[in-house]
Amino acid sequence: MAIRIKLKPGREKSLERRHPWVFSNAIHNIKGKPEAGETVDVVAHDGHWLGRGAWSPESQIQVRIWTFDREEEIDRAFFARRLQRAQIGRNDLIREQGLTGYRLVAAESDGLPGITIDRYANVLVCQLLSTGADLWRDTLVELLAEQYPDCAIYERSDVDSRKKEGLLPVTGLLHGTLPEMPVIIEENGIKIAVDVIKGHKTGFYLDQRDNRAIAARFVKDKSVLNCFCYTGTFGLYAAKAGAASIENVDVSSLALATARLNMQVNGLSDDNVHYNEADVFKLLRQYRDEGKTFDVIVLDPPKFADNKAQLNGACRGYKDINMIALQLLNPGGVLLTFSCSGLMPADLFQKIVADAALDAKREIQFIERLSQASDHPIGSAFPEGFYLKGLVARAW
């Protein structure tokens, strides 16, 4: 008989709307003794069935729902169906843009909570962030090896969120032979070097693909400051689009070395590109004090808020950095600014940038609102999947 999780009265509403998380404070009692990652059934207080998911005893999110179909068993066939559906959902995008790098599985938004899979040419990189994902690792690897026989499979489950599940970090080769790093992917006709072993996240920020192309529309014959540049891909797009000068800024010398490589693999001269290993906050203040200005500035910082307690501090950080960036823009210049925190509402982010403009004594116009690329879908019942917010603002 299935292990059963009964909810407290009134706590079934989010599951009836198909939100895939059950928090610990919503649970009334547990019938049975589930092991970490084991499949459990969730029922309302009156006993009616709600969903079937994975048990995470050490997490605040104690059940992550695999399915809302009572007839659907959680077995090898279930994961095969989910993986096939995820690939079908990307096929149009791959054909249209000629992609060799894309997000294959976007966790909850693809009905596979805790599972992220990115494809970089013939390397699949898995990030397993929950006990349920961890339990089904071997099955996932078998299925991926069958569906993608030419691909190596590498794991990058080395993120802090695993600690909340009581899991240790895991990295390493799961299947096949890993090619020499970096691997080269292509998007929008541009080649990009990706190191799946040492790179951020699974190796690269695939979610900014569309925004890199949008940024390129504003840069011809312009001076571009690319902040938190990582491997320099906003700058790479700018170089191809005819920017007059580009400054790529990051604290990582390894990232900047890859930024140089990206120019080389695309056959682009970097005579007009400056690579600056520096702290962005300090550098922007320095440039303001020196009276230095730019035509286009890209702000793509790391996440400022990992939890709600950090949100107020994140708001101050976003306001400060956007204020200084706006002070560095020439009249008519363009700021592309981003927040990758799922806790930051899009409207609040826009208000922060508007307030930053007031403090900077600049008049701005919001000319585009940006989000993550379409291979990072947002489930209709999972608003948390909308994490990347961006704005394009023109300053006068």
Swiss-Prot record:
Entry-linked PROSITE patterns: PUA (PS50890)
Instruction: Mention one GO molecular function.
Output: RNA binding
What reaction does this enzyme carry out catalytically?
Answer: cytidine(1962) in 23S rRNA + S-adenosyl-L-methionine = 5-methylcytidine(1962) in 23S rRNA + S-adenosyl-L-homocysteine + H(+)
User: Gene3D superfamilies, from UniProt?
Assistant: PUA domain, RNA methyltransferase domain (HRMD) like, Vaccinia Virus protein VP39
Q: Where is the PUA domain?
A: 2-79
Q: Enzyme group, top EC level?
A: transferase
User: Where in the cell is the protein located?
Assistant: Cytoplasm
**What is one term from the GO cellular component aspect held by the record?**
cytoplasm
Principal localization reads: cytoplasm
Q: Which Pfam families match?
A: Methyltrans_SAM, PUA_3
Which HAMAP family does UniProt cross-reference here? 23SrRNA_methyltr_I
Kindly provide the name given to this protein in its UniProt entry: Ribosomal RNA large subunit methyltransferase I
| Higher taxonomy | Bacteria, Pseudomonadati, Pseudomonadota, Gammaproteobacteria, Alteromonadales
